[in-house]
A protein has these predicted regions:
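Catalytic-site signature of metal-activated, phosphate-bearing donor transferases
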Residues: 1-159, 166-172
Length: 172
């Protein structure tokens, strides 16, 4: 798809997204949160740029992003231990970013965010069709949502106590 795009000359769109297919527990996911996971990976640096987000940086473009055929294959981690450790790091960074923006985590958000995430990706987006790998992928994602807001709540509590400087969120 990329060669065909450039065979016609300079591509017209400022950026192109590809469907990322995630490999998890030895299986290429075809549903749920694992596919299609659209990501911009081809872009004109004059008309698009990476965000400075601490987690899940993405490309923002001046104009509409076009889609390319084909899959971008992505192995998210070597092992389940690595994947869970990565989620722990990401949720710490996400909680810190939300905390810096002044956001707070209510009990309702801690409880409902993981539930709605699980239902959205396992039921609505048919993650159940990916079997045990799909269940594990969505369940870990839902737990990561819980961790993010629980860590944010921990930061909120420390903010009230005036103790947020240098907090290691991987220990919360």
């Amino acid at each position: 798809a990329i060669r065909a795009l450039f065979a016609r000359g300079m591509p017209p769109a400022p950026a192109y997204a590809m469907a990322r297919r995630n490999r998890f527990l030895g299986r290429w996911l075809a549903h749920g949160e694992g596919y299609p996971d659209w990501n911009v990976r081809l872009f004109d640096r004059r008309r698009a740029r990476w965000t400075e987000d601490v987690v899940h940086e993405h490309v923002v473009a001046e104009g509409p992003v076009a889609r390319l055929d084909g899959d971008l294959l992505h192995a998210s981690a070597e092992s389940i231990e690595d994947y869970v450790a990565k989620q722990n790091r990401y949720t710490s960074l996400q909680a810190q970013a939300l905390h810096a923006k002044g956001e707070r985590a209510s009990f309702a958000r801690m409880a409902l965010s993981p539930l709605t995430r699980f239902l959205r990706f396992y039921v609505v987006k048919a993650g159940f069709l990916d079997g045990a790998a799909g269940f594990a992928h969505v369940a870990i994602g839902a737990f990561a949502s819980f961790l993010k807001y629980t860590k944010l709540r921990g930061l909120d509590a420390r903010r009230l106590e005036g103790q947020t400087a240098g907090v290691d969120l991987t220990r919360l």
